[in-house]
Amino acid sequence: FKSDYKYKKAEFKDDDSKYAKLIKSIEANGIGVNKIIETPKAIGLELTQFTHPNLDIVEEIIRSASYEAGVSKTVKKNLRVANLQGVSEYNKEFENNSLLIYERKSKRSFNTKTNFTFRPYLASREDFFKGALLLENNSELIIKDNFFFSTNLKYSIADNFEDLTLPPVNTYPAQVRSDVKDYLRSFGDGIFIGRAQFDYHITPKKNHHLMVSAGILEEMFSGVGFEYLYFKQDSNYAFGFEIFDVTKRDYEMRFGTLDYKNVTGSANFYYRNYDIIPFDAKVSYGEY
């Protein structure tokens, strides 16, 4: 697997230690350093990251950062994603026999980004193509390393969804998303909420991961639920299941709800291909 990622060099001060340089170099490339420990033969790095989709990129960054910082010892990593245990190259014994060099203090942080997006709607009964130009804000409050609150707010600058007036063909009863046109017609009624949810991540046992979510989960549903994932280190597949208790939101897409509730569940299989044509795949079966 060849990456197009370009390593970013960090700026150092004259009096920076090799560990300060190592931290700056790694964090300049989108990876957080939680802890550095050292033994006579090796250095242990506890890292957290959400940016890079491939472990090869992370390893490339660590190699380049170690060289740039002048670190000559073997580097062992403990990689976490939202505090879920991903890759671990050292154990408790290594940690107990090491010297603590650095530990980041946990603190809250807030990230926000606003941009323009285009929302198409194809092959409706009224017309083949409808669409909207949206101004979207995505924000995330990191309360703890494994506890987040994220929001998505939308405002329609221009759309032609008001033309979507023909009702769905009522072939089957309880077509859950058959009233999507009622949601789309409300895009022009001011700011609406695409998502506002809490997420909590935990790895209770090696290779076993849980995520609990609650709040406004998407444009049409709010609720609470969890996802279980089994992922073994160095494998290219994962599997699990998810269960959610959801309530349908009203068409204004703010805080109101409709008189429809359901419990959904699905089994999931994930596969990552590293061969000539790299790709990620997800196969899911269940009630949505």
Residue locations for each model-derived region?
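Gram-negative outer-membrane beta-barrel proteins
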Residues: 120-126, 157-163, 218-222, 234, ...
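Outer-membrane beta-barrel strand-turn architecture
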Residues: 131, 139-147, 202-206, 216-220, ...
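Transmembrane beta-strand segments that form the barrel wall of outer-membrane beta-barrel proteins
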Residues: 1, 44, 112-124, 149-151, ...
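Phosphate-interacting basic helix/loop segments used at nucleotide- and nucleic-acid interfaces
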Residues: 22, 29-30, 208-211, 222
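Outer-membrane beta-barrel initiation region
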Residues: 1-202, 255-265
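A short acidic, amphipathic alpha-helical/loop segment
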Residues: 224-228
